[in-house]
Amino acid sequence: MVGHAATDVPPTMAVKIFSAGVAACVADIITFPLDTAKVRLQIQGECLTSSAFRYKGVLGTIITLAKTEGPVKLYSGLPAGLQRQISFASLRIGLYDTVQEFFTTGKEASLGSKISAGLTTGGVAVFIGQPTEVVKVRLQAQSHLHGPKPRYTGTYNAYRIIATTEGLTGLWKGTTPNLTRNVIINCTELVTYDLMKEALVKNKLLADDVPCHFVSAVVAGFCTTVLSSPVDVVKTRFVNSSPGQYTSVPNCAMMMLTREGPSAFFKGFVPSFLRLGSWNIIMFVCFEQLKRELMKSRQAMDCAT
């Protein structure tokens, strides 16, 4: 990411990867209930049993889940979520600057090099982290009160059952929509954040510090949610589906369109934005500060020796 103060030491690749992983895990822990609410809203419409609860809005979904299934249910799938951030966010965010430098031919990084870096790191991270995404979504989606009997008792039980009943390919189910979603998210999120931060710093509107990171993260979160929401909903439905429910990703999208209309593609938009916006703020602020502090500590240790 652009901008280092004169006294700052540019962070190493290892520092960036570590900082991205830690910052993403912190953000996930804080915002996970919003993500669970988003998943429940996105799959609403699939379960047509009379006993199924109807979720209304973000707060209503969170309250309903807490009352009917217990507050702990809001964090169902968190271990898989943290595994996902360690394997996924650490790479897509931590490697972004390094890959961007690879695509940069001139003195300054162009928009094309930023987009290429976002495409590359996002794509690589999806293939590595997809099994954690499948398990996370399925644990968040299953209810103990209505619909089909819960398929999994926990994170590692889910990995085992999916691998034994659906094969290893089951752990990579939904890779295509998730790849599309995360290419959009990675490019929009990182490129928008990078451009916004660069504009604020270069025009001397804000210094390269917490307020600048906060504003840049909010703008990046909104733009990302608008562009990624339709793909995100299809991805969630397809990943959570039972074997044979949908024949393909396009079939899933078409069934959503014919049964529920175009608005189905924006189900859970508000929790998506609240989650992604707040996640971006926490992650980027922690990421930037952690990078800076780690390099200061390293510099102090080098001076001491």
Curated annotation (Swiss-Prot):
Alphabetical list of Pfam families matching this protein: Mito_carr
Membrane topology per record: Multi-pass membrane protein
Mitochondrial intermembrane membrane side: 1-10, 97-114, 194-210, 288-305
Binding site for fatty acid 16:0: 56, 267
Residue ranges, Mitochondrial matrix side: 33-73, 132-176, 231-264
Name of the protein: Mitochondrial brown fat uncoupling protein 1
Membrane-spanning segments: 11-32, 74-96, 115-131, 177-193, 211-230, 265-287
GO cellular component terms, semicolon-separated: mitochondrial inner membrane
Solcar repeat locations: 11-102, 109-199, 208-293
Quaternary structure (record): Most probably functions as a monomer. Binds one purine nucleotide per monomer. However, has also been suggested to function as a homodimer or a homotetramer. Tightly associates with cardiolipin in the mitochondrion inner membrane; may stabilize and regulate its activity.
Organism name: Ovis aries (Sheep)
Gene3D superfamilies membership: Mitochondrial carrier domain
GO BP: any one term: mitochondrial transmembrane transport
Family: Belongs to the mitochondrial carrier (TC 2.A.29) family.
